[in-house]
Swiss-Prot record:
Keywords: Acetylation, Endoplasmic reticulum, Membrane, Transmembrane, Transmembrane helix. Residues 50 are lumenal. It holds the Pfam family SPC12. This is Signal peptidase complex subunit 1. It comes from Saccharomyces cerevisiae (strain ATCC 204508 / S288c) (Baker's yeast).
Length: 94
């Protein structure tokens, strides 16, 4: 079974489209972790779950504003398409 999965894995190539997407994902994870940490500290200091959830919600919205739009610096490096390893003859299906 392992050999079958390795064969399928060699034939299927799913790279991340842009190297900038890696940076964006790392930025997203880092900002959400910092937001969660700050929210926990604020919530603990105020002894309020409402403050914690509000602070985390604000950090999520800020992260969305920074990460979600297609800013030009996300597309600085051009996309290299993966070349298919399997050739399909579409003429035989006509």
């Amino acid at each position: 079974m392992s050999e079958i999965l390795q064969d399928v894995q060699r034939k299927l190539v799913f790279p991340i489209d842009f190297p900038s997407q890696r940076k964006t994902e790392k930025f997203q994870q880092l900002s959400l972790m910092i937001g969660a940490l700050v929210a926990c500290i604020l919530g603990f200091a105020q002894q309020s779950l409402k403050v914690l959830l509000t602070a985390y919600g604000i950090s999520c919205v800020i992260t969305l504003i920074c990460v979600l739009p297609a800013y030009p610096w996300y597309n600085k490096q051009k996309l290299r398409w993966a070349q298919p390893k399997i050739e399909i003859n579409v003429d035989q299906y006509d």
